[in-house]
């Protein structure tokens, strides 16, 4: 305990006792120095000093009512600023207490100047600093619920989630949340887990919410050109795979099928317009010139390593001209490839014929995904012919019918019946069934099933009526083994089952040719089996057995 010497005045003794009480409370952060103002008349002000560092934490209390700046904030000096001030200003080892009013006033002015300097140092110079803006938080750093709110407000577009998030699976999950909220329905039965949606992005589908599993079965193997080929088929129609399998068995047991490609070439037919029919006729004559054709071929072929122009055919309608380009596209189905080449040729033609106006890069004489006689008569994609000789024994034992019944039914149904219906390319029993199933399994463009299913099935009795000769002619099978859906894992695996995954390393187009042959042979197997069931009256029985659920 401290005791005051006897020569101390009462005022000095008061301050010593007061400081002893004050210091613990200030350092314990119980009360601040400014909070003490109401309790005494003079107040304090804080000044930096090296003299009393061990005692008052580098602060000395200066008394006097004039020194207090009430209702003004005390300057806060960061530690690094204190160090800079100590370097810039000489330290004061001792501060004399003012003796008179003049000294007090001069000391007060010095303190005010020091405080102004300190405030200037603390206040940032906004003129020399860039304006701070609120940083936009990246979408991917938000929670799914926060992103959902932004989607509902229209601040984020649903179809851009993959690009915004950089995570295709998360984009699908959030889009499912949005759809369920909009519909007030659960879509849990549509699966989305366990799928690599990065392979879909920018190639196969937009606004993805999941995928639809389709059962995949295999028919065969069928002996095709001396090799056994297994045929993957994706379908929801019961009895289809079983029926095709039976046809494959009948063909293989009879020695197999033979198949050949008679023509190949994807087509694109833009439509252009001229000022009058004279200009249109001059244009067609120019195109038909051999030298001019070779010049256009050079332009077309320069756009791709694989695309090779094989023909140009022009058709006039008034002052409009439809230019049907046909080109080999290797193992790709080739629509994008041929369109790129056509655009280059049109730009070249525009330089020569300045009055030519392009109406559309597709004028519907291609013809893509629509029934048309031009595909039936001139072909598109791969033109394929497949044949087999089925022995009479196999017809009776495997197909449960006879040769003459099959021949008669084929004439009445597939030939006369289709003709009476005005069919174009539909002279068959159910070619599209098999084409679609294989298209789904192997990642083809299913809408091109329209022209790819063009087929005429023919049957003849041979060897004195003992055996059956069957053939299918399909002039427009449009397939590829690279690009589009062929890159998806399941579809790629189905192509691998056939043995045509990817592009051919030895001969461009060989894999797509083999896929077209496989489809034609499977169609022939399906035709053979269905026609046998119809001729024997077994169709309804088989469908009741394989194509109806027990609850129906």
UniProtKB/Swiss-Prot annotation:
<keyword id="KW-0443">Lipid metabolism</keyword>
<keyword id="KW-0472">Membrane</keyword>
<feature type="glycosylation site" description="N-linked (GlcNAc...) asparagine">
    <location>
        <position position="288"/>
    </location>
</feature>
<keyword id="KW-0256">Endoplasmic reticulum</keyword>
<dbReference type="Pfam" id="PF00368">
    <property type="entry name" value="HMG-CoA_red"/>
</dbReference>
<dbReference type="InterPro" id="IPR023282">
    <property type="entry name" value="HMG_CoA_Rdtase_N"/>
</dbReference>
<dbReference type="GO" id="GO:0015936">
    <property type="term" value="P:coenzyme A metabolic process"/>
</dbReference>
<keyword id="KW-0560">Oxidoreductase</keyword>
<keyword id="KW-0325">Glycoprotein</keyword>
<dbReference type="GO" id="GO:0008299">
    <property type="term" value="P:isoprenoid biosynthetic process"/>
</dbReference>
<dbReference type="InterPro" id="IPR023074">
    <property type="entry name" value="HMG_CoA_Rdtase_cat_sf"/>
</dbReference>
<dbReference type="InterPro" id="IPR004554">
    <property type="entry name" value="HMG_CoA_Rdtase_eu_arc"/>
</dbReference>
<comment type="pathway">
    <text>Metabolic intermediate biosynthesis; (R)-mevalonate biosynthesis; (R)-mevalonate from acetyl-CoA: step 3/3.</text>
</comment>
<protein>
    <recommendedName>
        <fullName>3-hydroxy-3-methylglutaryl-coenzyme A reductase 1</fullName>
        <ecNumber>1.1.1.34</ecNumber>
    </recommendedName>
</protein>
<feature type="active site" description="Proton donor">
    <location>
        <position position="543"/>
    </location>
</feature>
<dbReference type="InterPro" id="IPR009029">
    <property type="entry name" value="HMG_CoA_Rdtase_sub-bd_dom_sf"/>
</dbReference>
<keyword id="KW-0756">Sterol biosynthesis</keyword>
<keyword id="KW-0752">Steroid biosynthesis</keyword>
<feature type="active site" description="Charge relay system">
    <location>
        <position position="237"/>
    </location>
</feature>
<keyword id="KW-0753">Steroid metabolism</keyword>
<comment type="similarity">
    <text>Belongs to the HMG-CoA reductase family.</text>
</comment>
<keyword id="KW-0153">Cholesterol metabolism</keyword>
<dbReference type="GO" id="GO:0016126">
    <property type="term" value="P:sterol biosynthetic process"/>
</dbReference>
<comment type="function">
    <text>This transmembrane glycoprotein is involved in the control of cholesterol biosynthesis. It is the rate-limiting enzyme of the sterol biosynthesis.</text>
</comment>
<feature type="glycosylation site" description="N-linked (GlcNAc...) asparagine">
    <location>
        <position position="375"/>
    </location>
</feature>
<dbReference type="GO" id="GO:0005778">
    <property type="term" value="C:peroxisomal membrane"/>
</dbReference>
<feature type="compositionally biased region" description="Polar residues">
    <location>
        <begin position="123"/>
        <end position="132"/>
    </location>
</feature>
<keyword id="KW-1207">Sterol metabolism</keyword>
<feature type="region of interest" description="Disordered">
    <location>
        <begin position="79"/>
        <end position="138"/>
    </location>
</feature>
<dbReference type="GO" id="GO:0004420">
    <property type="term" value="F:hydroxymethylglutaryl-CoA reductase (NADPH) activity"/>
</dbReference>
<feature type="compositionally biased region" description="Low complexity">
    <location>
        <begin position="79"/>
        <end position="99"/>
    </location>
</feature>
<keyword id="KW-0152">Cholesterol biosynthesis</keyword>
<dbReference type="GO" id="GO:0006695">
    <property type="term" value="P:cholesterol biosynthetic process"/>
</dbReference>
<keyword id="KW-0444">Lipid biosynthesis</keyword>
<feature type="active site" description="Charge relay system">
    <location>
        <position position="369"/>
    </location>
</feature>
<dbReference type="InterPro" id="IPR002202">
    <property type="entry name" value="HMG_CoA_Rdtase"/>
</dbReference>
<dbReference type="GO" id="GO:0005789">
    <property type="term" value="C:endoplasmic reticulum membrane"/>
</dbReference>
<feature type="compositionally biased region" description="Low complexity">
    <location>
        <begin position="112"/>
        <end position="122"/>
    </location>
</feature>
<dbReference type="InterPro" id="IPR009023">
    <property type="entry name" value="HMG_CoA_Rdtase_NAD(P)-bd_sf"/>
</dbReference>
<dbReference type="InterPro" id="IPR023076">
    <property type="entry name" value="HMG_CoA_Rdtase_CS"/>
</dbReference>
<keyword id="KW-0521">NADP</keyword>
<feature type="active site" description="Charge relay system">
    <location>
        <position position="445"/>
    </location>
</feature>
């Amino acid at each position: 305990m401290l005791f005051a010497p006897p020569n101390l005045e009462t005022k000095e003794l008061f301050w010593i006792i007061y400081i002893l009480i004050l210091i613990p409370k200030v350092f314990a952060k119980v009360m601040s120095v400014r909070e003490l103002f109401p309790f005494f008349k003079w107040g304090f002000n804080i000044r930096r000093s090296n003299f009393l560092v061990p005692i008052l934490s580098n602060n000395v209390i200066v008394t006097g009512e004039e020194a207090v700046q009430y209702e003004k904030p005390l300057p806060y000096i960061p530690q690094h600023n204190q160090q800079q001030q100590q370097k810039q200003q000489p330290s004061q080892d001792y501060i004399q207490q003012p003796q008179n009013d003049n000294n007090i006033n001069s000391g007060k002015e010095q303190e005010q100047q020091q405080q102004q300097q300190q405030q200037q140092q603390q206040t940032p110079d906004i003129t020399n600093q860039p304006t701070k803006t609120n940083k936009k938080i990246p979408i991917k750093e938000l929670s799914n619920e926060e992103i959902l709110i932004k989607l509902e407000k229209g601040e984020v577009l649903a179809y851009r989630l993959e690009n915004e998030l950089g995570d295709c699976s998360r984009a699908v999950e959030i889009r499912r949340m949005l759809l369920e909220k909009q519909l007030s329905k659960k879509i849990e039965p549509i699966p989305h887990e366990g799928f690599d949606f990065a392979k879909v992005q920018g190639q196969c589908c937009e606004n993805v919410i999941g995928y639809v599993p389709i059962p995949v079965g295999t028919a065969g193997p069928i002996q095709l050109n001396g090799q056994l080929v297994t045929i993957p088929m994706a379908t929801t129609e019961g009895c289809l795979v079983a029926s095709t399998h039976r046809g494959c068995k009948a063909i293989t047991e009879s020695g197999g099928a033979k198949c050949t490609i008679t023509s190949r070439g994807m087509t694109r037919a833009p439509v252009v317009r001229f000022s009058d029919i004279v200009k249109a006729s001059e244009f067609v004559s120019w195109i038909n010139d051999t030298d001019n054709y070779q010049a256009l071929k050079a332009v077309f072929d320069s756009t791709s390593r694989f695309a090779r122009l094989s023909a140009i055919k022009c058709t006039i309608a008034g002052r409009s001209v439809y230019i049907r380009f046909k080109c080999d596209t290797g193992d790709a189905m080739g629509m994008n490839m041929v369109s790129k080449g056509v655009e280059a040729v049109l730009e070249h033609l525009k330089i020569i014929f300045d009055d030519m106006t392009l109406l559309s890069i597709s004028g519907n004489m291609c013809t893509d995904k629509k029934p048309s006689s031009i595909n039936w008569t001139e072909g598109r994609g791969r033109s394929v012919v497949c044949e087999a000789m089925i022995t009479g024994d196999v017809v009776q034992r495997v197909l449960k019918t006879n040769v003459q019944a099959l021949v008669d039914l084929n004439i009445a149904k597939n030939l006369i019946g289709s003709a009476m219906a005005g069919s174009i390319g539909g002279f068959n029993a159910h070619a599209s069934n098999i084409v679609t199933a294989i298209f789904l399994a192997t990642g083809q463009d299913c809408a091109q099933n329209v022209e790819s299913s063009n087929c005429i099935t023919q049957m003849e009795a041979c060897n004195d009526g003992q055996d059956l000769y069957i053939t299918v002619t399909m002039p427009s099978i449009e397939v590829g083994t690279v690009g589009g859906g062929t890159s998806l894992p399941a579809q790629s695996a189905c192509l691998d089952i056939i043995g045509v995954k990817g592009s051919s390393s030895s001969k461009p187009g060989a894999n797509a040719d083999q896929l077209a042959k496989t489809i034609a042979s499977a169609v022939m197997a399906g035709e053979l089996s269905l026609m046998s069931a119809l001729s024997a009256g077994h169709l309804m029985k088989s469908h009741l057995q394989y194509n109806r659920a027990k609850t129906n």
